[in-house]
Curated annotation (Swiss-Prot):
Family under the similarity heading: In the N-terminal section; belongs to the N-acetylglucosamine-1-phosphate uridyltransferase family.
Role this protein plays: Catalyzes the last two sequential reactions in the de novo biosynthetic pathway for UDP-N-acetylglucosamine (UDP-GlcNAc). The C-terminal domain catalyzes the transfer of acetyl group from acetyl coenzyme A to glucosamine-1-phosphate (GlcN-1-P) to produce N-acetylglucosamine-1-phosphate (GlcNAc-1-P), which is converted into UDP-GlcNAc by the transfer of uridine 5-monophosphate (from uridine 5-triphosphate), a reaction catalyzed by the N-terminal domain.
Start and end residues of each stretch annotated as N-acetyltransferase: 247-453
Keyword Magnesium applies: yes
Protein name: Bifunctional protein GlmU
Keyword Transferase among record annotations: yes
GO biological process: cell morphogenesis; cell wall organization; lipid A biosynthetic process; peptidoglycan biosynthetic process; regulation of cell shape; UDP-N-acetylglucosamine biosynthetic process
Record localization: Cytoplasm
Length: 453
């Protein structure tokens, strides 16, 4: 049994953004949720998030999670922020885990190691990391596992600055925590209350303070846009490695972007520059071409999305293909062996087995029957200025190039629509519909007009 407090009240001025720092996205979800999910993995008895700057937005992001919220009205430092949780946890005996909402790489395994030290008798345990360049971090002084102190860089003599072990900002405490917090002073230039001051307070009360050295990568926090990009890069490398280990082929993996919510099957091939977002699910043997973007899209086994295609909320069945340069909007469903080619846009439409729309077409709010061919430049005119209307095209129909089907309208099975037609009435099964002005040839007109006759 333990309680976990996540500190998420900071303003994040160096981000230069109106969005609260902890809500900046990493691979499609707010940074704070990474810290929250790591905390939940250990099944805490109580989970408190301390919010402050932009707190209303932060609380919205926490909706649906089993958390309690404490408010830090004034941002007076990390120790002051933690003290705001006392009202919720006053009767909780401990131990307590404390992490930061802007440190999203911490693993449950590392947090468990901190908690174990306190359960084994330490009063306080803190996570440390050895950094190649510790500039800007407080240095850890210790003997063995015992922490003697934390020296801020500005106060450190040269021999202390040479130390590369730093405080990573994650802690475990025993039940003495809130009493100790009340002894923290703000005798510093910023007039703020800092968590590292608890090291000296715990030691003064005869309680052991131990260090747990973690992986340097996990200690990475986010205070700037550059650091945000660095952390996102770490998350991406982990995710790519995980999927390649499960049988996904990535060509130039460092160029591929994907989010944790994406699901991939073995023998999927991802070409350079592919972007996979949201609840995208890609089946076995599928291929995603260079610079294709898939969001909330399903590719069933054997489907292909070719270069520079954008698909949002689409569903491609086995053997279907789209692209290059196609656009599939929400509700686009391509059944088996459908092909949608270059510069074809499909929105809220069902294309049955074997439909071909090779180039330069718009199919919106339509249902197209099995085996039908859609010529170049075909448009389903679905919007009358007030409402959307449906176009229905039967099986094995042929819609000639540059035709416009003005919805609501139906073209029957095996019907033909002549090129360049504007269809405003239903076309019966097996009929030919031609709706265009008859061609006239005026002999000699051009020569006379140009004065060369």
């Amino acid at each position: 049994m333990h309680a976990h407090v996540i500190l998420a009240a900071g303003q994040g001025t160096r981000m230069r953004s109106r969005l609260p720092k902890v809500l900046h996205p990493l691979l499609g979800k707010p940074m704070l949720l990474y810290a929250l999910e790591a905390a939940l993995a250990l099944k805490p008895e109580r989970l408190v998030v301390v919010v402050g700057h932009g707190g209303e937005k932060v609380v919205e992001a926490l909706e649906g999670y089993p958390v309690e919220v404490a408010w830090q009205k004034e941002q007076l430092g990390t120790a002051h922020a933690l003290l705001q949780a006392e009202g919720l946890l006053r009767d909780f005996p401990g131990p307590f885990l404390v992490t930061q909402g802007d440190t999203p790489l911490l693993s449950p395994r590392t947090l468990e190691a901190l908690l174990r030290r306190v359960r084994e008798g330490a009063g306080m345990a803190l996570l440390t990391a050895e950094l190649p360049d510790p500039t800007g971090y407080g240095r850890i002084l210790r003997e063995g596992e015992e922490v003697l102190g934390n020296v801020e860089e500005k106060d450190a003599p040269p021999e202390v600055r040479a130390i590369r072990e730093v405080n990573a900002g994650a802690y475990a405490f025993d039940g003495f925590l809130f009493q100790a917090l009340k002894e923290v002073r703000n005798e510093n230039a910023a007039r703020e209350y800092y968590l590292p001051d608890l090291i000296a307070i715990y030691r003064a009360h005869g309680r052991r303070v131990l260090a747990v050295r973690g992986v340097a990568e996990e200690a990475l926090g986010v205070n700037t846009r550059e650091e945000l990009a660095r952390v996102e890069g770490v998350l991406l490398r982990r995710l790519r490695a995980e999927w390649m280990g499960k049988g996904v082929r990535m060509i130039l993996p460092e160029t591929i972007y994907l989010e944790p919510s994406v699901e991939l099957a073995p023998d999927v091939t991802l070409w350079p520059g592919a972007v996979l977002k949201g609840k995208t699910r890609i089946g076995e043997g599928c291929e995603v071409g260079p610079y294709a973007v898939l969001e909330d899209t399903v590719l069933e086994p054997g489907a292909k999305v070719l270069a520079h295609t954008v698909a949002q909320g689409a569903h491609l069945h086995p053997g279907a293909s789209a692209g290059p340069f196609a656009r599939l909007r929400p509700g686009a469903v391509l059944m088996e062996e459908v092909h949608v080619g270059n510069f074809v846009e499909v929105k809220n439409s069902l294309l049955h087995k074997g439909v071909k729309a090779g180039h330069l077409a718009y199919l919106g709010d339509a249902e197209v029957g099995e085996g039908t061919n859609i010529g170049a430049g075909v448009i389903t005119a679905n919007y009358d200025g007030k409402r959307k209307h449906k176009t229905e095209i039967g099986k094995k129909a042929f819609i000639g190039s540059n035709s416009v089907l003005v919805a609501p309208v139906r073209v029957g099975d095996r019907a033909l629509v002549g090129a360049g037609s504007v269809i405003t009435q239903d076309v019966p099964e097996g009929a030919l519909a031609v709706a265009r002005e008859r061609q006239k040839n005026l002999e000699g007109y051009a020569l006379r007009k140009l004065g060369e006759g």
